[in-house]
Amino acid sequence: VVETPRRSMNKLINSNDSVKRTIDEAFMIRAIKMHLAPAVKEEHLAEIVKNATLEKFDANQELFKEGDQGDSLYLIRSGSVTVSKSIGEKNTTLAYLPAGNYVGEMALMTDMPRSATVKAAVSTETIVLKGEDFRGLLSKNPDTRHQLELLIAQRLEQNKEKKSGHGEGLV
């Protein structure tokens, strides 16, 4: 293990695009493995990460809007987001999600429009996985797919409770 001061490391990362991309890819693999697909081997994740991008959002900027067609999954690298939904005439905040969480998987797995609007609560950076790469990951990893299907079923039930006014569900 080599310890490098943060300032020196940031200077190195920003000095060369290929160094920055290599370090970003290593981070993306680790983040996806830790938060989204723990059972998937790193070499399989490396293929997906080649197409992944990092996207920054300012506070209050939308990642996506309720009703949009889903084309990507967003893993929150830094910052946080709010998840809200139109219920009747009112816009209701369903959840506040900090770094390490992900959004957008429901639309990708169900082929339905986005079920909620997601906005950056503060300056936020995300790892963006394209829908086709995410679906490819799930098709090769049925255990990961099953875990996400269970989570989606739970979120849909919580959304239904929230919409009827009987719950404090999270999305």
Predicted regions and their residues:
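Cytosolic regulatory regions built on CNB/CRP/Popeye-like sensor folds
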Residues: 1-171
